[in-house]
Amino acid sequence: MPFTKQLKALSDAFHERGIECKWNEPMAGHTSFRIGGMATLVAWPAGQSQIITVLNLWRELGGKCPIAVLGRASNVLIPDRGFHGLIVLTTRAKRVVFAEDEAVDKDAFRLENKFTCQVFAECGASLALLSQSCAKDERGLSGLEFACGIPGTVGGATVMNAGAYGGDMQSILLASEYYDLTNGYTVTLRAEEMGLDYRHSIYLDHPEWIVLNSVMLLNYGSAPDIRARMEFNTQNRRDKQPYELPSAGSVFKRPVDNFAGRMVETVGMKGACVGGAQVSEKHAGFIVNRGGATAADVMELVHRVQDAVEALYHYRLECEIQIVDDGLDPNGPLTWD
């Protein structure tokens, strides 16, 4: 197996520092798709400082084996052959600080006023849980209502500029801090430096930059009104989206002046299956795992949908699910193209 020596050294170093790790971990249980082969080594750092320790060790011990840093893996597809390297799961790095409770470096970001509150969140913090916390009577913070049903982490949402129901991360982000795998430096970017656009940020262009935390600016409002908006969004999701089956959320980026789901349905692909993967019969913008689906099933189904839509509309849908590939397949990396 490639990189065994470096991975063994990493495992030993993690144990010495009290960082939990496991060998040959099945990744299907860690993804919302419930799909994926085994990762050679998986680490669970307990907070941002341990994430930095893990990444520093990876660099110090060679920096050659494949590495992927994931949160709740709600928007990813892991190949059936697995990941022959180190996967870092950040879900235990979930510290959240509200500026009204504890000082945030206000000089580094934007001065708050009586109408707003800065919120600092480590990359592994649950976006949905954070939105629920903001809606409590003692908080009454508005801006994250769109996120109440998004299953990912703050880090993943920052990378993808996640959004729904007219809101997105771009509308609330002040800054984010990242670790650069190429040199070991940590860097803070202001929102205007993050290249935020529809389902895009500069982090997608720089996979070597690992988001450590984000700072958001939320507005004070009526907690009951905030909760009412969240309940409306939640019910809308339940009514229209296939939450009863594993998926990776919306599959395709929204085209200009159209909807991906509508286009997929128009070309007759709603309900189409490949193996255990199916275009949802409830919402054609989703692909669900009906049981036993493989990554290969999903990829083949995505390609069939793209081909069918392109044949009619002369437009190729862009898949927004991220493939976690170790780059070791002799046939080349897996892509949606």
Feature locations, PLM:
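Short coil/turn segments at secondary-structure junctions
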Residues: 113-114, 160, 289-290
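Phosphate/pyrophosphate- and phosphate-bearing ligand-binding catalytic cores of soluble enzymes
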Residues: 21-23, 29, 76, 179-303, ...
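Short, flexible micro-motifs
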Residues: 39, 74-78, 88, 127, ...
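Anion-binding (especially nucleotide phosphate/pyrophosphate-binding) glycine-rich loop
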Residues: 2-154
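Structural signature of FAD isoalloxazine-binding scaffolds in flavoprotein oxidoreductases
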Residues: 41-48, 77-101, 123, 159-191, ...
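Short, well-ordered alpha-helical segments in soluble proteins
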Residues: 134, 138, 154, 158-162, ...
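A generic local secondary-structure boundary/capping motif
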Residues: 75-76, 132-135, 144-148, 161-168, ...
